[in-house]
A protein has these predicted regions:
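Hydrophobic/basic alpha-helical segments
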Residues: 1-155
Length: 155
């Protein structure tokens, strides 16, 4: 039998997993990748790209980075880590809106966006509902003894 090396942190399918199952390295890498792409938004704004187009570019190239595989780590994020991820979107909106930016909540409303936390929460709920509806997973979820239905229900 071949001996395996011990590693403190490992990358698997683009997600960093640490030996203590904290998500600090993964959160750091998400922030690093997202902020490295922010310069693209800044340059495009400088040359006069519209707010609508900048928002589309943000959603495609930056928000997708923050949401990749979020179902696997959302419930385990610390408040500090969640805040760091939210700061990415806040910073992007400040760049995109410029002088029109008056606050994060107003910017979200103006752009028709939700907080990243709310989006991750919805994705987790959607994932849980899909799991309960899959016939192969029925045995994993207990039935309510009164109604003989599963505890997890639709929205």
């Amino acid at each position: 039998m071949e001996k395996m090396d011990h590693v403190a942190v490992s990358k698997l399918l683009g997600v960093w997993i640490s030996e203590d199952l904290s998500w600090s390295k993964n959160c750091q890498e998400i922030c690093r990748r997202a902020y490295s792409r922010l310069s693209m938004i800044t340059k495009l704004k400088y040359v006069g790209v519209s707010v609508e187009d900048l928002l589309d570019i943000y959603i495609l190239f930056i928000r997708s980075v923050t949401e990749y595989c979020s179902v696997s780590f959302h419930s385990s994020l610390t408040q500090e880590q969640s805040k760091k991820l939210e700061t990415i979107q806040k910073t992007v909106l400040k760049v995109i809106l410029g002088d029109m930016y008056i606050g994060y909540t107003a910017a979200l409303e103006m752009c028709g966006l939700e907080t990243l936390h709310a989006r991750r929460q919805k994705r987790c709920l959607d994932f849980a509902l899909k799991c309960t509806k899959n016939p192969r997973n029925r045995r994993l979820f207990p039935l309510n003894p009164v109604s003989n239905e599963q505890y997890i229900r639709d929205k």
